[in-house]
């Protein structure tokens, strides 16, 4: 359909932190490719979305609600921004609202918009982890979410099981960066050469560095004593670089600390193994084909609340994202009291040579292309198609029709 024949679409996109901002920018580019100039965009986001023409009414720094006990001082500002965002959506009255990740912020926006303007369709791009804890959220979302755009392949079945809103898998954003993760022939050869490159990935928050980096360093000392020389690369974010360098300066083998994303991905393509904090990075490592040991420690209060909720409410066999996608516990995980240098070293050492432990991970990671539908349409293109479909449906049927459909279900 040409721009002239296609009725203009009005969309409002909300992202509350940097990762969501990047997803929002990719979505906007895909929407522009599909709809050209027949598109009006509003939103709340960061620099990436601003570069695509979305002028946010305020900076999104500080909106991320992370941790269980560390945010009371920011709550008044956060709730003020929630009201401001919802009111801006209602004033724009778009054909669809797209909220991206950060559910503690974006879902409050969505609920307020549904109360104030119930005919605006709402899509949630990146599901909250209803499969990990508080699964009752899935059913509750039916009241204010019309479509979930999932980035993990097992999520649509989980929403169906939990009685949540319609959910469609569009693909993980890492799929669009797969070439950055995987080695060429020369880099693959470096993975087999000595000294082995080992990635150290202790997380991107101060608390993670504080709880993990010392234990990682002690584990590496044990591994080096038994394996011989290692080349260590520790990617981090700029605002933590000085803290990381100081903390790792006394290691038996000081790591090369890198903050440039290009250097990080170059190290991924050459690494033989990794020691990593639990999180999205475990899926990055799996897609890169790097055998990994994963660990996590947090404050005692957060551990009491989160780890028990995760295990008891959802009965998850693992908290490692790559394991959940694969459907088996391939990457060994060491959480809280189990996260000791001795255990980390014992799990990491076999990954440096041709052992059953290493082969099991490499073989499992080879199945990810099929599981995650890598090689087809880009995730941002799939997401843009669904967003456009929902928005155009509202345009064809009118807001009243959509409101009646939601009300009577």
Where are these regions (language model features)?
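Nucleotide-activated sugar donor-binding and catalytic core shared by glycosyltransferases
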Residues: 1-409
